[in-house]
Amino acid sequence: MSDQPMIEITLDGAPRTIEAGITGALLLQDAVKKDGVVAMRVNGEPWDLERQVPAGAVVEPITLSSEDGLNILRHSATHVMAVQEMFPDVNLGIGPFITDGFYYDFGAIDAVTPEMLREIEKRMKRIVKEGQRFVRRDITEDQGREELADQPYKLELITTKGAGAEGASVEVGAGGLTMYDNVRRDGTVAWTDLCRGPHLPSTRLIGQGFALTKSSSAYWKGDQSGDSLQRIYGTAWATNDDLKAYQTRLAEAAKRDHRKLGAELDLYSFPEEIGPGLVVFHPKGAMLRHQIEQYVVDRHQDYG
């Protein structure tokens, strides 16, 4: 008989009695192996598997291919983006997951070229293969300021708790501050970031279903009066087949892009001197314009 105190929880809708202090990884170990569980929801909030399950918690497993799982996968991918490895003096912005992918903002760096993207992705694949663990640490504001003393954007997030920063909820929130370490197999820390998490247990689970897609300029906190940053975008999926299917969908959509077809068929154009998004129909596009106008008239008549 274990001397460990017992607690009551709800797992997948059913009551369970477990030892106090047990982690999600231990509680869900069979589902981790059988069903590809990579995280858990605790009282509705996504958590890392290495966190201890509290008494009274409602626990639900999160699989990699689920919506929550893909969001965690994509956020974890930002933590293997080896930009700081290539440019040690870069200033770290924010790195949230977005629809179908992720991005990370960087300051004090020149425009990112396609060659740089290829090199960053190459290094990401190496980090994924290494199987670095994502380790969560609770910190105080003073500890955060000390650890991130050379990172002005992170210091600002600590001070303001992310107020007004697009995507900053992945870094800080209303609760305490946390850091995530990328820990190598030998126990050394490869990289650290201010982050709320959650993350996958290991970089290896990111797999090969990711790719960097593009870069662009962005403003810190989305404010045009703020610093100009470089934003690197990527996409990530549960499998490489899912990635290829996504890339195929994008390629097919590009073929049907109305801007591309309009120019190729000499139907219309968007002259820059007139203004962005303002269409000029060509003679060959007269019938198309008529059909669009008639559709609008018909809809107005239908709805009175």
For the regions a protein language model found, what residue spans apply to each?
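Ubiquitin-like/PB1-type beta-grasp interaction modules and other compact soluble beta-rich domains
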Residues: 1-83, 88-98, 122-123
